[in-house]
């Protein structure tokens, strides 16, 4: 478990950090593996080390994926209307990942060790609660309101004069 508090969970996470070069923790939303499993899942990207050691200054990249391009429900549907962070993940891999706020951040091995080796993305996110916000153009919104008003007036006229 990435965040379990029992001794065995902690020992496994410490073993991973001592014996591998953990490069990334990618946190995926609940529902990615629906209909088989609805739980939040993470995957780890790591390389083998030549010798076991805990390098406290080593940085680990965290990426918080909000969607995979699907509905994240048991009745799986895909389409452009669903958030898809996979292209962003692939684009950032091997590049300057620090620019992808609030999706990505770095944490040191020392900070992870100080937190009982917990590898849950939420534990280290400096952006907890922040979401990327996109706003529609006000002119587009006003145009939509005007169209709806015209439709309403047309419907009201038809109701007044049913022939």
Language-model segments: which ranges?
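A conserved structural/catalytic subdomain of Rossmann-like adenosyl-cofactor enzymes
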Residues: 1-163
